[in-house]
Amino acid sequence: MTLPQAIRDKIFLMEEVINFPTSLLFHKNYHWENLAMVHYSNLSGAVESLMERGRKVAIATGFYVPAGNPPATETDGPPGALILTEGLKYLGMEVSLLSDEYTLSTLKAGLKILNLSERDVPLIIFPLEHSDVDHSSRTVNEEVESPLSIRFVQEFMNGPLGRDLSHLIFIERVGPNHTLESFLAQEVPGNSSLKDFEIILPPLLRNRCFSSRLEDITRFTAKTHFLLEFGKKWNPSFESIGMGDRGNEIGSGKIPWRVFKDHGTSNREPVFCCRLKTDYFISCGISNWGGYALMAGVALAKGRLDVLEKITPEQEGMVLNHLIHHGPSIDGITLKQDYSVDGIEFNDYMRVIERLKEIAFE
């Protein structure tokens, strides 16, 4: 099914808003890090996919910051996952939330403030792989070294929550950076950037999960990317959507490594950029905005704008505040329990969300 042009135009405008939001904001000195990714963003494709095939959806999120005060998951990711969870469920889809133990309390707090039980929305906890304590475990055959993760993927895909899964959505979920194999799979034959890759990413830095500060958080990160790499062995029909704002999130593998090397805003992007690609990728200045845009697009396409009526500054502020204090969650930039997301104070953060809603209702 192809969306009517009028709806496609609105979705294009939403995508523009979440990638180039500066004109909407009171403070103009924010620094956006997603510009290299915008060309690869496909919000309309993600909307069409959910519109046509959305039945049973699993949403993965959680970006843990061990250097935070306190150490906690970011405020970017869970709010976007929760708005999608609530909205898609309202539209009649089965929805589950998936993360690891470091984000569990935040997601539980989110469901509680939304008056949703774990019977309404199952919480799936992907186990941490003990081998990741050994730094060298990622430089050998990772599948062999990760029996716990492989078994979990198999059991999930064959179980009641994964069987007949139509969509797997990743929102601000950190994923591993490149390996030599993933780099070569992206490269055009004869390209001379192999030497650059080997200099920038020596073997012991490959297949690791990094924050944008180049903090190695591999041992704090369950291998949720295995759902993409190996999940189709047991469920070949699901489609995947990824959302990110820096390039170290699952889904960003849609963007070639050399793009991050040549057009990144710092020399850190080619180190931390994730190799995992999804069927559809949504670039955004803040990943939560991608979740709101996807929800607004699906509501618009289905003619169900009533789904968006609950989205107000008061409601979203209440949810964010609850996550901060009861998750807990922290701002990934300030590293504190601030009433902000990625360094963007709440009023400015909310202006983008309100604009998405305005576009849908225009």
Language model region names:
Residues K56-A58, S166-H167, E239:
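Structural motif
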Residues P71-M93:
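Histidine-anchored nucleotide/phosphate-binding helix
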Residues G242-E362:
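C-terminal functional extensions of proteins
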Residues G62-V65, R173-P176, R246:
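Short glycine-rich anion-binding loops that position phosphate/pyrophosphate groups of nucleotides
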Residues M93, K232-S240:
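A short helix->loop->beta-strand "cap" motif at the edges of active sites that frequently abuts
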Residues M93-Y102, M243:
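Short internal beta-strands
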Residues A109-G231:
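An acidic, phosphate/nucleotide-engaging active-site surface
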Residues M1-K56, Y64:
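Positively charged, low-complexity intrinsically disordered leader regions
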